[in-house]
């Protein structure tokens, strides 16, 4: 995984904003926050987001078209993510489960499928909202 000091200025700025957020952020919300720091074009934001996803610093929540920081310093999963999402407060938790990972790997092997990536999102109510 790429270290933060190897990131571009734009990537560092955007990563910092995402890491400080308690909720997933959409690209245009990020753009609004970074305009005062000299990042004015949506393309600049999307390039930085794509690179940060690729190197595993952030994850994309596909159903929300939003981004969160990877909280697991040992995360090696840039192409395979699993999240639980609260439908009430929209809290997102990244799930790290070795048994689930093994099951998905076995499923892939049994089906003879080569996945480029997968993103699983489980929806329900968190402990606070039940």
Predicted segments with their positions:
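Key DNA-contact positions within bacterial/archaeal DNA-binding proteins
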Residues: 43
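A short, conserved structural fragment
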Residues: 53-61
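Short alpha-helical segments that sit at the start of domains
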Residues: 1-16
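Short acidic, hydrophobic short linear motifs in intrinsically disordered regions
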Residues: 24-34
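Short amphipathic alpha-helical elements of helix-turn-helix/winged-helix folds
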Residues: 13-21, 33, 55
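Short, hydrophobic-biased segments on the C-terminal half of alpha helices
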Residues: 46-50
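Non-DNA-binding regulatory cores of transcription-related proteins
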Residues: 60, 64, 69-130
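Short, basic interhelical loop/turn and adjoining N-cap
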Residues: 36-40
